[in-house]
Amino acid sequence: MHDMTKDIEYLTADYDNEKSSIQSVIDAIEGQDFLDVDTTMDDAVSDVSSLDEDGAISLTSSVVGPQGSKLMGYYQNELYDYASQLDSKMKEIIDTPFIEDIDKAFKGITNVKLENILIKNGGGHGRDTYGASGKIAKGDAKKSDSDVYSIDEILKSDQEFVKVIDQHYKEMKKEDKKLSKSDFEKMMTQGASCDYMTVAEAEELEEQKKKEEAIEIAALAGMVVLSCINPVAGAVAIGAYSAYSAANAATGKNIVTGRKLSKEERIMEGLSLIPLPGMGFLKGAGKSLMKLGFKGGEKFAVKTGLQKTMQQAVSRISPKMGMMKNSVLNQSRNFAQNTHVGQMLSNMRGQATHTVQQSRNWIGQQAQNVKRIVNNGLDKEIAHPFKQQLAPAGMGGIKFAETTTLRNMGQNIKRAVTPQNHVTHGPKDSMVRSEGKHSISSHEMNSSKYVESPNYTKVEFGEHYARLRPKKLKANIEYTTPTGHIYRTDHKGRIKEVYVDNLSLKDGDRNSHAQRTVGGEDRLPDDDGGHLIARMFGGSKDIDNLVAQSKFINRPFKEKGHWYNLEKEWQEFLNSGKEVKNIKMEVKYSGNSQRPTIFKVEYEINGERNIRRILNK
């Protein structure tokens, strides 16, 4: 049987943009730089002192970490408080009125007992006694009136109806083996037009099932619509078959599933799809009946002249039958006019837009305040953290201008303490080409093996995500997957390095959503969600192993597909009994982008060291 359903759709782009704005401000004042700056300065002092054999240099620094961290924490708390208030406000002006009015709208068309429906004889002739001119009786009709009949009375007085019920029972019995004849007959004569569960009732029920995050309203067509040649048979059948599924005929089926509104599904569009009576809601119900009741063809026909097919039956509807159907529709339209659901939903768009605009203005002001304080106030606090003294021969002085900031401070320190006699790579090493590949000498073979570093905080697998939406990795951490793969993140929570001691073939799962969304706003149209360690090697399915990767390197494109080819090469070596060991991946980014620019992969195959540099394009 076909259920006529309507869904309420939510367009969440505006709200998602709002969340992105909040997150961008939080990112702008991320406190990790403040928390680490004291350690960085201490390390610099230590490095300089280790090279200053004659003790000619004296360096002192000011502690800035606690102050910067405090400021960062203040703004994060303020932003989270704001986000919480925004959520509550939107629930107040959108969710609550919407739910309340939906409940009111359905209250008038649900739980209508078939046993209380009276059919008033319109003066038909012969076997058409309750036929085309009959209509649902008004409120002043009484069961005792000579020209008024209940459905139960009509069914018992006409064996043709009894035969139809028997035939339908046999069909429904095929779907529900436990359906008894008595339950079916009771449902046919005493059932309700449809059953409705309010959102409040549904939420209480779902509390036992760990509430879901979205709401889905599926309305079953349940009004009594006379869509058959015989109006009484139509009334009974449509009331029964549209309100109850074949597998649950005796107990009924709820209109609302009751899933809880998601916090992210606030800005509601597409509200015209709500199934109000008289607006396409009833028409579908008749089609549902026709599809079920006459799918068996001629054996389901009744004496009133139904032909073999649904199309022929519809063409036989008489003018009187149409008048009676219109009478029912008018009653439904009156109901629709008496409810303010439509007006409420129309106004809702304006309220939601106003709320979003207010929040955008607030975010804009806060972003400017944050920018001003970070660029001005903090610079003054940390200017001249070092007092420059004498520098030994062979080292550059540590110079800090009046406008020294956290951003360039680390670069100055790094330049000052880096020895000038460092080893440079040869031409082959320095070439950054997507197809770059070479072997290196034995004295470099251990350079890519995993070495512990104090610059990363080790966390348990499962604790490596920040409590943010959308999901994001924590900054400056090291985590190990259940398969033994080690990952490190940078100060932005981006995967920076990956280490695998001994690669092996293991089947992994796939997370399609993560693969479609990783990289966020920096993702390009031609990007895939690329696994750093492939699923066939036991790589994680989540964003802790995924990056935005050009499909031209991630797939087997002719003359390209460099990442794909590397994975296939490893697979072939493992299948042939060779070892792929000591893998180190370095993932390079540009600025604050979440999309990598270059992948550098080092690995050993049977003791021979290899390096690949692959451009992400």
From Swiss-Prot:
Q: Which Pfam families match?
A: Endonuclea_NS_2, PT-TG
Instruction: Note whether Nucleus occurs among the keywords.
Output: no
Q: Cellular location of this protein?
A: Secreted; Cell membrane
GO cellular component terms attached to this protein's record: extracellular region; plasma membrane
Positions with biased composition (Basic and acidic residues): 426-438
List every stretch annotated Disordered.
420-448
The name on file for this protein is: Type VII secretion systems protein EssD
Gene responsible for this protein? essD
